[in-house]
């Protein structure tokens, strides 16, 4: 009996060991999934602006970032007028042991009344020097050219020398302005750098005794996007361009609201001559105790004209957001009285004229004078940013009455508050349905699990009601506003799963954008962010690449697909009626590979399938300056001769199949 039991046990053990690899493989690869795509019954059209971008000046995204001015506080208009400017006290650059002098700020007989402050350096001895520290340093590339300029007035010294020094104090570039007189004039010279510095300084030296007056001191790269004199930083715009975004929402965000109405964003102060654009404190100056930024202001070198121009450059529809008479409801919640809204409504009407009006109109003429006689083709405006409640609705009605009467062609985007659920959200949606609003902006900064479990969020939205703008969203690895949030593969792939739901419901969801877009690695206030940069370099995060592969592979019509979301598999399908391609997106949120078969009804393709894959077996994987494409798209192909296409989905992967559909 014992012997029989031992022999039986040995036989079962051998059988178990023989079958173990097959069992493990079956569990590891999971059951083969069938992805059924019915091309014979195409659904609704998808908005051509489905996946876009949202730019807000947070994390030093504008000054110190997309707008590549290297001099901080160039017009001396910060609350502390000498912010960013320093004498050589306790600091010695090579050859700059500065003789005595002093810096003072004045307002008599200014360059203009909009920005009245200017600097008066006085040299007691020849060789007096002072410097600007830039935006967490001044970054310059060896061999590159930079335009050094300033408005100068002087009855004394006739020259001003400029040197750029690296982190060790070594001079890596120099130039000189000269020929001053006692009237304000702009002078410039081009400086070629002979070495690279990530955190350099701009030093200014007066070689004669006496004083001179300085304003709008600038060090600006010559090589900008499209080589414009007041252009944008090339590498950052290239990353935006590569997204092929359907729209550009600007300039915010909470900076539209301001802490107080006096510090709200006013678009009219951001156009025209750059030296006359009124400097303003940034809303994110001191929002978070853990990331204070007392030197965070807005010069508006990047203003509404430049935003419209950027949208045009990258092929995106412009979506400006305007203050509706309400300051940030998380701060002062200050509200303009209903009988004081004329100024706010006038701003909206004048903006339409600035963007679309004839050159014979006042604001259309300004657009033409700035170099763009053709209209910018504005089709939509946001009324308020992240507002909610009865006061908001009252003010929206005033805007809507005026705008719809004069410009019925302009769609109005309204807010549903800052959160994706709860009483304020539900109340706002009920109101917007009653008022037949055009587009409702929803925001969600939630956990990765929330994104995974909400892929069907829009499956049951009313198809006859307002359209949806998923205006701000990002998976938070720790929690909203946490300084410990990461841009890792887990956040990115969860967003991808959610985006399949946006795409499948493209008849309701008209637009979607990740937020925030940009962050300076040394000057951020908010994590996570799609693109990180320093003074010289930049890279896209895994979240950026998810946005890219979706925006670059969106069709023109929804195609029914099953399963939509089951067992860690999330899918969507679209047809591009222009290229005659069927695009199938499959997200495998599983640590194991998964076999699948794409079964097509309505077409029998033959030819080459283009495959784009984003994948990492490590959910904590991130990109970095040293490894900017650690998680990034890979391309491959697959030949097919039928409508039954076997595929293999990698662990934790986003895979896109572009299938011939002639």
Map each language-model feature to its residues.
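Bacterial N-terminal signal peptides that target proteins for export
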Residues: 2-13
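Bacterial N-terminal signal peptides
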Residues: 11-23
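Extracellular and organelle-lumenal recognition/adhesion modules and their flexible linkers in secreted
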Residues: 27-299, 317, 332-342, 349, ...
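Conserved, mostly hydrophobic/aromatic
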Residues: 53, 150, 244, 311, ...
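Solvent-exposed strand-to-loop "edge" motifs in beta-rich extracellular domains
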Residues: 151-155, 192-194, 552, 587-589, ...
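Active-site cleft segment of glycoside hydrolase catalytic domains centered on the general acid/base Glu
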Residues: 173-177, 186-188, 221-223, 227-231, ...
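Catalytic-core region of carbohydrate-active enzymes that cleave or remodel glycosidic bonds
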Residues: 401-404, 408-411, 429-432, 438-553, ...
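Carbohydrate-binding surface patches
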Residues: 568-605, 611-614, 652-658
